[in-house]
């Protein structure tokens, strides 16, 4: 019988990739939700409905980001507590995070449904797009609690040493989404509403399946126990995981700015082309995010156990893997630009040509993105939410916003597609500076004789 990989193990490249592989696949399937919606809506409901989804997606992703914030910050706290040998307290923290997520999800769901129309108008919905924006946004927001729970469990299942269970739940949700999209959008011709219902029901599968698992007797490292909400650990988790929320909010703001700029300079086709780029980026970046989510509990555990040698091992291997991943993804993005554009917008020759061109310019961003995502996640796992948030804030809100606004003014309008790449280069410099600045505090660049084996 194959031996289960434990957080306390020493990780070789093979063992590390085996442990994080379910998380990577899990994130890819999660990203497929929006991609499949966009694919079916674009081909069966038209480019106006497709543009409407792209316009409201930033708002929806902010709500999902809150789940990631609680999940990553809470997992760092729970993993560190496990590393310190305090099992009962780890279970209490875990249960507290799940309860808080469920209650907050219901509140945000109601708020999103009620205020979807003014939100769509604020995001710049044209009269032609408005009703589609409101319809899609309200239906998807009705499932916010399940969406947030799904994002939270993605992190906690890894800390519970059950990454394959997380993968199974996410694959089940992804298959549900694709099957229902085919049925509701292509079969019943429900249009944008069918895509929204398919997404919402798939999120229920991804969020409620792990909840049922933890409510029953199980063999994982974590248990749901009776608990009450406590301000200090909740603030600790939310503060530490704030970089994930910051990243989602900032990315959403950048997407809004991109849409505004593209509507101004290129028109509705620019928004649709950007939508295709974002969908493909979701899948590509999911590889880096999945890796970072997968190794974060390992980092948190060994930080709690004061095993400095293993921290150094994790950092070295992760940096090399992220560099290799960036090179491969950049080449793939360039090679697959035409077939992927054809898949989404092949019905419109002008839009197809624009999307292919934009895709090739945009692809260089993947060279640097993985390293920056890992650096932010690494500091979250170490309990330093401030630096993690700073990397995310500068990478997305500051550098990307500045690039989107300034590049078309200084250079050609075409250079707006380079904005993300320029931002990632500056973010890489910041990440390297922070890693070197904090090396003595966390000892991840030295083999400490005091580290435990």
Where are each of the predicted segments found?
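Transmembrane helical elements of multi-pass membrane transporters/channels
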Residues: 18-37, 139, 173, 202-206, ...
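Small-residue-rich hydrophobic transmembrane alpha-helices
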Residues: 50-110, 147-166, 273-337, 369-391
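Residue-level signal for transmembrane alpha-helical positions in Major Facilitator Superfamily
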Residues: 17, 33, 70, 111-115, ...
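Transmembrane alpha-helix boundary and packing residues in multipass membrane permease domains
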Residues: 23, 27, 39, 76, ...
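Short alpha-helical transmembrane segments in multi-pass integral membrane proteins
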Residues: 1-20, 78-145, 176, 187-242, ...
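Helix-terminus/linker motif at the lipid-water interface of multi-pass membrane proteins
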Residues: 32-50, 120-127, 183-190, 252-283, ...
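N-terminal transmembrane alpha-helices
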Residues: 8-45, 58-73, 77, 81, ...
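Short runs within selected transmembrane alpha-helices of multi-pass transporters and secretion channels
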Residues: 71, 139-158, 169-177, 195-208, ...
């Amino acid at each position: 019988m194959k031996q289960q990989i434990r957080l306390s193990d020493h990780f070789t490249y093979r063992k590390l990739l085996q442990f994080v592989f379910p998380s990577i696949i899990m994130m890819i399937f999660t990203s497929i939700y929006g991609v499949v919606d966009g694919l079916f809506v674009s081909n069966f409901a038209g480019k106006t409905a497709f543009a409407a989804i792209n316009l409201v997606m930033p708002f929806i992703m902010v709500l999902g980001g809150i789940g990631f914030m609680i999940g990553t910050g809470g997992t760092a706290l729970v993993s560190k507590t496990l590393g310190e040998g305090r099992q009962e307290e780890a279970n209490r923290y875990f249960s507290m995070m799940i309860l808080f997520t469920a209650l907050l999800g219901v509140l945000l769901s109601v708020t999103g449904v009620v205020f979807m129309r003014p939100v769509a108008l604020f995001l710049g919905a044209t009269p032609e797009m408005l009703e589609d924006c409101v319809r899609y946004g309200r239906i998807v927001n009705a499932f916010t609690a399940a969406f947030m729970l799904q994002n939270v469990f993605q992190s906690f299942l890894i800390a519970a040493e059950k990454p394959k269970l997380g993968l199974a739940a996410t694959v089940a949700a992804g298959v549900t989404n694709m099957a229902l999209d085919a049925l509701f959008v292509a079969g019943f011709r429900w249009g944008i509403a069918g895509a929204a219902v398919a997404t919402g029901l798939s999120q229920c599968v991804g969020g409620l399946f792990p909840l049922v698992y933890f409510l029953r007797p199980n063999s994982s490292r974590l248990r749901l126990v009776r608990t009450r909400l406590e301000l200090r650990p909740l603030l600790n988790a939310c503060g530490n995981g704030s970089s994930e929320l910051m990243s989602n909010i900032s990315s959403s703001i950048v997407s809004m700015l991109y849409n505004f700029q593209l509507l101004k300079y290129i028109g509705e086709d620019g928004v649709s082309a950007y939508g295709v780029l974002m969908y493909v980026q979701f899948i590509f970046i999911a590889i880096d995010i999945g890796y970072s989510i997968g190794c974060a509990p390992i980092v948190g555990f060994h930080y709690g156990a004061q095993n400095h040698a293993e921290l150094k091992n994790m950092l070295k291997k992760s940096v090399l893997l992220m560099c290799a991943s960036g090179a491969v993804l950049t080449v793939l993005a360039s090679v697959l630009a035409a077939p992927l554009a054809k898949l989404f917008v092949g019905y419109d020759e002008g839009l197809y040509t624009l999307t292919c061109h934009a895709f090739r310019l945009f692809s260089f961003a993947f060279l640097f993105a993985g390293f920056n995502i890992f650096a932010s996640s690494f500091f979250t796992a170490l309990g330093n939410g401030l630096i993690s948030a700073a990397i995310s804030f500068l990478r997305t809100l500051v550098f990307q916003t500045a690039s989107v606004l300034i590049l078309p003014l200084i250079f050609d309008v075409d250079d707006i597609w380079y904005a993300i790449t320029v931002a990632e280069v500056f973010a890489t410099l910041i990440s390297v500076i922070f890693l070197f600045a904090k090396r003595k505090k966390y000892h991840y660049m030295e083999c400490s004789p005091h580290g435990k084996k």
